[in-house]
């Protein structure tokens, strides 16, 4: 987005849903797109810090605002990026282009403090990676191979960042919530087998 007050404001060169860009998305597009996402996040953070100072000076503790178009991961649209068993062109909220242009975005309704504490790339402490080195107990990371929002590289980054020396990874043929037949049983069996070898 170019203008946070206008959800229709888009840079065509960085529009995930502009057919001129893909899918399939060229590696150069994905790099520029990710840079654009990070730059947008930093712009919102800068505004949130300034706005928080402004409203506090006026006697308020916080204020609400909206962040549009957050269903925006290229992997949701282009299954050739990190191929898995996930359905093509699908996210948790349905077809990505429709989800992206709806009012049901991830973090769409937020506050200044919530943005800074949960979504800001430069301020939030909610990202797992910086803290996973402190996890030194035995750990099992399970990846669902049909997940439309969490991808194998996400699970791998979690696994790699863990401080545990005893750590394992497993992949199960499942969606994000392990709703497909047999998936929850497979998950339970995987956990039970892993735990039985340790305790």
Predicted stretch roles:
Residues 119-120, 139, 190:
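A cross-kingdom marker for long, charged
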Residues 148-154:
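Conserved alpha/beta-hydrolase "acid-adjacent" motif
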Residues 135, 141-143, 147:
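Short beta-strand/loop motif that positions the catalytic acidic residue
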Residues 155-159:
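Short, highly selective alpha-helical patches that border small-molecule cofactor pockets
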Residues 172-199:
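Catalytic active-site module of serine/aspartate enzymes centered on a nucleophile-bearing elbow/loop
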Residues 2-130:
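Alpha/beta-hydrolase
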Residues 132-136, 161-164:
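Short, conserved loop/helix-junction motifs that constitute active-site signature segments
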């Amino acid at each position: 987005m170019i203008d946070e007050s206008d959800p229709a404001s888009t840079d065509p060169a960085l529009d995930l849903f502009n057919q001129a860009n893909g899918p399939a998305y060229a590696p150069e597009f994905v790099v520029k797109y990710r840079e654009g996402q990070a730059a947008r996040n930093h712009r919102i953070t800068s505004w949130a810090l300034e706005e928080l100072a402004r409203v506090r000076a006026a006697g308020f503790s916080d204020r609400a605002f909206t962040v549009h178009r957050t269903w925006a991961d290229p992997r949701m649209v282009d299954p050739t990026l990190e191929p898995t068993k996930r359905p093509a062109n699908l996210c948790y909220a349905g077809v990505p282009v429709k989800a992206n242009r709806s009012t049901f975005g991830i973090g769409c309704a937020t506050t200044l403090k919530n943005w800074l504490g949960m979504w800001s790339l430069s301020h939030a402490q909610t990202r797992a990676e910086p803290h996973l080195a402190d996890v030194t107990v035995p750990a099992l990371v399970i990846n669902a191979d049909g997940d439309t929002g969490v991808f194998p590289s996400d699970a791998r980054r979690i696994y790699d960042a863990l401080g545990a020396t005893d750590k394992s990874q497993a992949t199960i043929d499942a969606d994000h919530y392990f709703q497909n037949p047999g998936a929850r049983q497979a998950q339970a069996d995987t956990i039970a087998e892993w735990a039985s070898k340790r305790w």
